[in-house]
């Protein structure tokens, strides 16, 4: 099968790699339909690293994936061949204290797609644990399926901060995660959502997704615009989603 392999910094090749075969117990074989390109994928491509994670060997990129179930392993229930699914990219060890207490996102042995040395999903087929695979509506456009992963980030953020009816929310950064945080905040009941960025195209996208006030921080004074829009009250919840240094 084919995969998009990052050979080294700024060198991405479509290569033939071994097919993963049939799924074992509790696993699914999934045919990948669409994969989102995250900022981390871009950094690995342009810089060959993110923080302490260096691409020392060829690696398949992509961790935001949507596909269809092609084969079902023993012990798996609730799935049928052909189901449209989203795939959670981080698979924990399921045997440490973090995993036992439901905080598996902190697992020290987490295997996260497209994080060196773990391969990602820009390939034709993957084998994935059924417990980290989620059914999507059959009529959903598969091209938006990968957005489930960043959407989960936004949902977690809104839940953790307790966004509720009447809140005035500020979101710094109008990229993918920032826009999704804005949408989720509105759905959670926020009265007003204010978004900022230095890119007019992103701000226009934020407006189209329901942001009440979009501020360009390079041409407008952020503080004065926020207080003006909120009649001097300011905001009671703020999210940092700019993702810059």
Where do the model's predicted regions map?
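Glycine-rich beta-strand-centered segment in the early N-terminal region that forms part
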Residues: 18, 22-35, 50-97, 137-139
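Beta-loop-alpha module in the N-terminal Rossmann-like domain of NAD(P)-dependent dehydrogenases
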Residues: 240-245
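Mid-domain Rossmann-like dinucleotide-binding core that forms the NAD(H)/NADP(H) cofactor-binding site
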Residues: 140-220, 224, 237
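Cytochrome P450 core scaffold surrounding the K-helix E-X-X-R motif
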Residues: 40-46
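NAD(P)H dinucleotide-binding glycine-rich loop of Rossmann-like/cofactor-binding domains
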Residues: 93-172
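Short SAM/SAH-binding signature in class I
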Residues: 233-239
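Conserved acidic residues
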Residues: 83, 124, 212, 236
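Conserved amphipathic alpha-helix within the SDR
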Residues: 222-232
């Amino acid at each position: 099968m084919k995969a998009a392999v990052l050979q080294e910094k700024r060198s991405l090749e479509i290569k033939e790699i071994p097919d993963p075969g049939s799924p074992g117990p509790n696993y699914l074989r999934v045919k990948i339909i669409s994969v989102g390109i995250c900022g981390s994928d871009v950094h690995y491509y342009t810089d060959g690293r993110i923080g302490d994670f260096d691409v020392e060997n060829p690696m398949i990129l992509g961790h935001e994936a949507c596909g269809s179930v092609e084969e079902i392993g023993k012990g798996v229930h609730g799935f049928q061949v052909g189901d449209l699914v989203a795939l959670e990219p981080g698979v924990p060890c399921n045997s440490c204290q973090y995993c036992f207490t439901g905080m598996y996102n902190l697992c020290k042995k987490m295997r996260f797609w497209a994080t060196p040395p773990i391969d990602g999903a820009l390939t034709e087929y993957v084998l994935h644990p059924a417990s980290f695979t989620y059914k999507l509506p059959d009529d959903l456009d598969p091209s938006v399926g990968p957005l489930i992963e960043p959407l989960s980030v936004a949902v977690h953020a809104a839940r953790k901060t307790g966004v509720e009816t009447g809140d005035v929310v500020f979101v710094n950064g109008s990229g993918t995660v920032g826009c999704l945080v804005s949408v989720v905040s509105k759905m959670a009941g926020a009265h007003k959502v204010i978004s900022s960025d230095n890119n007019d195209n992103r701000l226009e996208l934020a407006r189209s997704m329901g942001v009440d006030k979009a501020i360009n921080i390079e041409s407008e004074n952020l503080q004065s615009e926020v207080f003006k829009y909120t009649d001097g009250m300011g905001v009671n919840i703020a999210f940092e989603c700019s993702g810059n240094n």
